[in-house]
Amino acid sequence: MNKPVVRFAPSPTGYLHIGGARTALFNWLYAKKNGGTFLLRIEDTDVERSKAEYIDQITDALSWLGFDWDNNVVLQSKNKSRHKEVVNQMIEAGTAYRCFLSKEELDTLRQESEKKKELFRVPKTYRDYSLDQQQALIDEGKAFTVRLKIPDGITEFSDLVYGTIKVDNKELDDFIIARSDGSPTYNFVVAIDDSDMNISHIIRGDDHLANTPKQILVYKALGLAIPIFAHLPMILGADKKRLSKRHAATNVQEYKEKGFTPTAIINYLSLLGWNPDSDQEIFNINELISAFNFNQVQKKPATFDEKKLLWVSGQQMARMETSAAVKEVESLDSNWGMNQDSKYKNDVIALVKDRSKTLNDLIEISDVFFKKSISYDEEMSKKILDDSSIQIVADLHEALNIEENWRKDALESIFDNLMTQHELGLGKLIKPVRFALTGLGYGPGIFDMMILLGKDRCLNRLSDAAKL
């Protein structure tokens, strides 16, 4: 088998969204697994909506995710002369023709069909006009579009996800490949660009299934090799409607800002439509490349669940090497741990990363180890530090103040005595203590945390909390 050449071809009309990132991932995984080539083409022919800032954001997001594309980025807008050249070749060859039906004429015909409750079909009035007849109409100043001459028969293709798909060409109109202003249409330029880039496998969302027969007809009209297709299942929100901003953040940049790592995003996206032959859900990148197979990609729409993403992220956070986690946090927040000893920072991250789901969690929890004092949230203080809780904090301060051995066993003994004194279980005892020491309602094990904070810092914070 020849090594595959795949492409990711986003339109720069917005930020890279979750669906686009999943498409890029599956292309990238397939190329990596099979020693192939992963290309990036920006489909920027929509002049009004395409923006340079979106191109930059898309390429930055792909780089952040680690999807290293081969060769230079291809801008579709740079291929305009090539597209026009092929349109003219097809007119000369008789595989396409100029259609002089105006928009107004087509609208009238469409309305007549609607009145009769008939399916509207574009008339093939000019399909068999000779080049001379077409030129005569041009000389009269008639505007025209260019349409593909669709032959009789069946268009059939084999999809790696959907299997064999057949479309009767009678169901298709002679569709436009160039508009009246000369600009080529999507299904035409995609086929030309994919052929010119030697794309062997087209991997994209299943919303493009309906476009595929049209693109195959363009390939056939030009005598071009037809690539292999794989259409990925749609991503839905929890309400089973297409994923949108009302369900969750939809672009990759937002998840980066929320503190998700590339590995967590990639791991979760891989599970949206792909079902490995095992119960394994947590993968590193090399494991994903090795395991990925289109035989396991499902037709059924995938449901995006941000809670599941958080769970995957937490699992990845726990597996991350401490030194790597420190680097990730420092790259996200340059002020994090400033003027702190590197060993202490590593010790802090090693302690808190198993309880964190994102890098933002890591920053929030670890920050309490660097502060001299804690700013307590007023609302949380009222809920957690009632009179009995304040007494627990005060009693703990008194016991710690006279304890000379700052060791885990000594702390455990003090807490045992407090449990007896206040007739409480450890969980209820820890809640106000944790809040007093960190200002948070969650975090690492209380004894390990206190050891790392140090006696003086613990005493000062307990004293501050007891005064609330």
Task: Describe each model-derived feature in a short phrase.
Residues D386-L437, Y442:
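C-terminal accessory/binding modules appended to enzymatic or scaffolding proteins
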Residues L222-I228, L232-Y376, T438-L468:
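Catalytic adenosine-cofactor/nucleotide-binding cores of aminoacyl-tRNA synthetases and other
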Residues N27, I58, M90, G94, ...:
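Residue-level signal for inorganic ion chemistry
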Residues M1-R7, V252, E287-F292, E330-W336, ...:
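Short amphipathic alpha-helical segments and their helix-coil junctions
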Residues M1-K115, N211-L224:
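N-terminal Rossmann-like or analogous alpha/beta NTP/dinucleotide-binding catalytic cores
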Residues A21-L25, T263, G427:
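Short, acidic loop-beta-alpha module within alpha/beta folds
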Residues V6-P12, L40-D44, M197-I202, D416, ...:
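Glycine- and acidic
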Residues R98, S102-H231, L236-L243, N251, ...:
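Active-site cores that bind ATP or allylic diphosphates and position pyrophosphate for catalysis
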